[in-house]
């Protein structure tokens, strides 16, 4: 099975690119982030015409996640249990959607940005990751879950775990994505029983997944590695390869992120 994750940065602007990507890569399951539309605005028909089922979670032009699958799409959950609320009038944001696809419990995740260190959104980000980690640990724990469960937590994590996951650490001084609390919250998923398999298969430094649109960041390869896949032991054992589809940052109207693809043995 081929499982991909992609922050598409507006699915309505990039539906043709997304469908073309599915077709030319033979991807079976695609987790999307930053779809930026309500559920009823999502271009479902384009994916159905290509042979895929779709589950979406979106309220507005902000955030939004989806899962596209041609190997089943069962037991859809919008938001994870204990997902924290945010806002002046606290509400659930469209940042997590789960579904069982081909026997794997796939979660498409769009982790909060954090905005700036000390901002309420930064605290929300840390709480969001901490709560997700607790849930994910329970899914694998004997008694509350199944240690042999097939679970994949994929998406835009908005954390650069290593200094070499950004092109110039000095640029990020006092900024989000690289602070010790964020990195610790990200690393805690290892202690919950998960393996970040993109690093296992692509250990090289400066293998970025995101380049800002401004200041010629992509031509200069001034990027960030912030799109990852934490998977359960059962899925880690099946993962034979990972690719970062850098060419998707080229061409007309690309997203600022590129797909990350996992190959899972049958």
Regions inferred by a protein language model and the residue ranges of each:
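N-terminal, active-site-proximal structural segment of metallo-dependent hydrolase catalytic domains
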Residues: 1-56, 62-65, 161
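Conserved beta strand-loop-helix elements of the APE1-like EEP
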Residues: 61-76, 205, 217-238, 264
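Surface polyanion/phosphate-binding segment centered on an Asp-His-Pro turn
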Residues: 243-266
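Surface-exposed cleft-lining segments at the edges of enzyme active sites
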Residues: 80-87, 111-130, 170-174
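Active-site-proximal beta-strand elements of phosphoester/diester hydrolases
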Residues: 1-10, 103-118, 257
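Structured beta-strand-rich core segments of catalytic domains in phosphoester-bond hydrolases
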Residues: 35-38, 42-116
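Metal-dependent phosphoesterases centered on the DNase I-like endonuclease/exonuclease/phosphatase
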Residues: 50, 128-226
